[in-house]
C-alpha cells in the first residue's frame, strides 16, 4: 500500500488542490463559475471567491481529470458546442485534459469520443460577462483559451492505514479446541476514491467540502467453515460456502460502483472505470476477466481421517472484506462486503503432526442462481 507521502506525490497536482480558475488573457479576471444547480451552463464571471468558483480536479488513470464544483459536486460535461454542469455519470464527455502551455497557464481540452483527431479546448464565447464556455478547435496560437489558477487551496488527503502481513492460519491448542470463528484480520491494501463516485447519505455538496476523498479498505482473514473430531479412519461430509451473497454484491455496487466477478477479480462500473488501475494496484486486487458476477455457492465435501488415532480438524476459507470510509475514518457500510474464496482454504488440525484429511467427493448443492 502507498503511504500518505507516496500518495501525496503519486496523485497529480490536479487532485491535491481546490482551485479558482481565471482566463489568463482577459483584460479583467474572468473566473469560471458553475451554476447553483446541475444541468446549467458553465460561465465566466467576475472573480468573487464564491463557492461556485471553487473546483476540484479528480485525476484518472490515464492522466485526464474530472472537474467537480465544490458547491454541489456537479462536474464539467461536454455537450454539442459548449460545456455544462451535470451530475457525474462516468460519461467520456466528463473527462478533460489539462494541457500545460507555460509554467503558469494551461488549457482544458476534451476529445470527441467519435473522432480520435477531434480535440477541442474550452474558450469563453465573448469577453463580456457573463459568458458561456464553448469549444474551439483553434488551439495552437489561441491565447483566449489559456487559464491560470487565481487561487489554490491545498486539499488534505485521508490518512490510509498501513498494510499488514497476510493473515496467519489459526492453530489449534488441543483436541477439544475448535479454533476461532475468524482469524485476526490483516489490512491488505487501501485506496482513495473521489466522493462523486460513492453513495452516502451525506449530500454531495457536503461531501465536496468535508470529505472530497473517501477510501476503500481491503482486509483479509480466515473464516471458519466447520470443526469436528474425526475418529480413526472415519469419513465425514461437511458443508462449505464460497462467493458473495446477492445482498452484499448489490450493496457493494451501489456503494462504490464496483462488483466482484466470478473469478474474484473486480468489475468496475461507468463511474469508477477511470480509476480501476490505481484502485486494483492499491488494494492488491485484480480486474476481472469475466462478464459473470460472483455468486454464493454451497458445497458438500467428503473428508477422511487416514490416521489410526482421533484428529480434530477445523476447515477455514480465505475471506476478503471491503469497507468504505470517509476521510475521518468513519465506516460508511456498517456491514462489510465479504467474499469467501474457496481457491484458498486450509485445515487446522490437532495433533499438529497429524496429516490433512483425505478429500473425497465434492458436490455443489445450492447457489444464488438456483
Swiss-Prot record:
InterPro entries, per the entry: Ricin_B-like_lectins, Toxin_P42
CDD domains xrefs: beta-trefoil_Ricin_BinAB (cd23429)
Post-translational modifications: Processed by proteases in the mosquito gut, probably at both the N- and C-termini.
Annotated stretches, region: Pore-forming domain: 156-370
Pfam family, one: Toxin_10
Keyword Disulfide bond: yes
GO molecular function per UniProt: toxin activity
Primary location recorded for the protein, binned into one broad class: other
Keyword vocabulary terms for this entry: Disulfide bond, Sporulation, Toxin, Virulence
Region called Beta-trefoil domain, residue ranges: 1-155
Subcellular location: Spore, Perispore
Region forming the signal peptide: none
Propeptide feature ranges: 1-6
Subunit structure: Forms a heterodimer with BinB.
Description of its domains: Has an N-terminal beta-trefoil domain and a C-terminal pore-forming domain. The trefoil domain has barrel and cap subdomains; the cap has 3 carbohydrate-binding modules while the barrel is involved in host cell receptor binding. At neutral pH the carbohydrate-binding modules are accessible on the toxin surface but the barrel subdomain is not.
Family: Belongs to the toxin_10 family.
Name of this protein: Binary larvicide subunit BinA
Gene: binA
Amino acid at each position: 500500500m502507498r503511504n500518505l507521502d507516496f500518495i501525496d506525490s503519486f496523485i497529480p497536482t490536479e487532485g491535491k488542490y481546490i482551485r479558482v480558475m481565471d482566463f489568463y488573457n482577459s483584460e479583467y479576471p474572468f473566473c469560471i463559475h458553475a451554476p447553483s444547480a446541475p444541468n446549467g451552463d458553465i460561465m465566466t464571471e467576475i472573480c468573487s471567491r464564491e463557492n461556485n468558483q471553487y473546483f476540484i480536479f479528480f485525476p484518472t488513470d490515464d492522466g485526464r481529470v474530472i472537474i467537480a464544483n465544490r458547491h454541489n459536486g456537479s462536474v464539467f460535461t461536454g455537450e454539442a458546442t459548449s460545456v455544462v454542469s451535470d451530475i457525474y455519470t462516468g460519461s467520456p464527455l466528463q473527462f478533460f485534459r489539462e494541457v500545460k502551455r507555460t509554467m503558469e497557464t494551461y488549457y482544458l481540452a476534451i476529445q470527441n469520443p467519435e473522432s480520435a483527431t477531434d480535440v477541442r479546448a474550452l474558450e469563453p464565447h465573448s469577453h463580456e460577462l457573463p459568458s458561456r464556455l464553448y469549444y474551439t478547435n483553434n488551439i495552437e496560437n489561441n491565447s483566449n483559451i489559456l487559464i491560470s489558477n487565481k487561487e489554490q487551496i491545498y486539499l488534505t488527503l485521508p490518512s490510509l492505514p498501513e498494510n499488514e502481513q497476510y493473515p496467519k492460519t489459526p492453530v489449534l491448542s488441543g483436541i477439544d479446541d475448535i479454533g476461532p470463528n475468524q482469524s485476526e484480520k490483516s489490512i491488505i491494501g487501501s485506496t482513495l476514491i473521489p466522493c462523486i463516485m460513492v453513495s452516502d447519505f451525506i449530500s454531495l455538496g457536503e461531501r465536496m467540502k468535508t470529505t472530497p476523498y473517501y477510501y476503500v479498505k481491503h482486509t483479509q482473514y480466515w473464516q471458519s467453515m466447520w470443526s469436528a473430531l474425526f475418529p480413526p479412519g472415519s469419513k465425514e461430509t461437511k458443508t462449505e460456502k464460497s462467493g458473495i451473497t446477492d445482498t452484499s454484491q448489490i450493496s457493494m455496487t451501489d456503494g462504490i460502483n464496483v462488483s466482484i466477478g466470478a473469478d474474484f477479480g473486480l468489475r468496475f462500473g461507468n463511474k469508477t472505470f477511470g480509476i480501476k488501475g490505481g484502485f486494483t494496484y492499491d488494494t492488491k486486487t485484480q480486474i476481472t476477466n469475466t462478464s459473470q458476477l460472483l455468486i454464493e455457492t454451497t458445497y458438500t465435501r467428503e473428508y477422511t481421517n487416514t490416521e489410526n488415532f482421533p484428529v480434530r480438524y477445523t476447515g477455514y476459507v480465505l475471506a476478503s472484506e471491503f469497507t468504505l470510509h470517509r476521510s475521518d475514518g468513519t465506516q460508511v457500510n456498517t456491514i462489510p462486503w465479504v467474499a469467501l474464496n474457496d481457491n484458498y482454504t486450509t485445515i487446522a488440525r490437532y495433533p499438529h503432526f497429524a496429516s490433512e484429511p483425505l478429500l473425497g467427493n465434492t458436490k455443489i448443492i445450492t447457489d444464488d442462481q438456483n
